[in-house]
Amino acid sequence: MASYTIVYFPVQGRCEAMRMLLADQDQSWKEEVVAMQSWLQGPLKASCLYGQLPKFQDGDLTLYQSNAILRHLGRTLGLYGKDQREAALVDMVNDGVEDLRCKYVSLIYTNYQAGKEDYVKALPQHLKPFETLLSQNKGGQAFIVGDQISFADYNLLDLLRIHQVLAPSCLDSFPLLSAYVARLNSRPKLKAFLASPEHVNRPINGNGKQ
């Protein structure tokens, strides 16, 4: 029986990184899908700590905030670096992912038509730090930190994949990031999840953009 439950809208959004993590780590979970009409009625929203989703259940532990959920899974499943130094770097990477994700969400939900061209033009400067980090770790042939996968890898992979949908050539000038995405995409359990109807048929965002 699954001990994890994801309560979220019928989109990838802020939950796909945790789904990728759980699938790749051979963990089972349940989905409680919240229709927007139901959400707008109010009671569920009022019951959520910050008035927002996702909500995550791990047994009797209830968590909100997607990055807190990822960090919890990182600690629980041994995906937080091998020592405190690596854990600090994993946190740094994840904060960098969050910075770019917030820019992406703002574009998608508030300024897509008018802002997409400028966003894509500025994208290389936001991707470059991740290419640099890869180059500093085993020549870019491993993970974003150390020699074992971390929760930040799943979050970064999700971020890069959705940007490849937004701008298909965005990684062309970043050979290490391109190889990194291909390498993680090919992990057997993750590859199976990414090919599954659950992933393929779930839109990235909730407003029809991607």
Curated annotation (Swiss-Prot):
Sequence positions bearing N6-acetyllysine: K128
CC terms in the record's Gene Ontology section: cytosol; mitochondrion; nucleus
Protein name: Glutathione S-transferase P
UniProt keyword annotation of Nucleus present: yes
Keyword Metal-binding applies: no
UniProt-annotated binding residues for glutathione: Y8, R14, W39, K45, Q52, L53, Q65, S66
Similarity annotation: Belongs to the GST superfamily. Pi family.
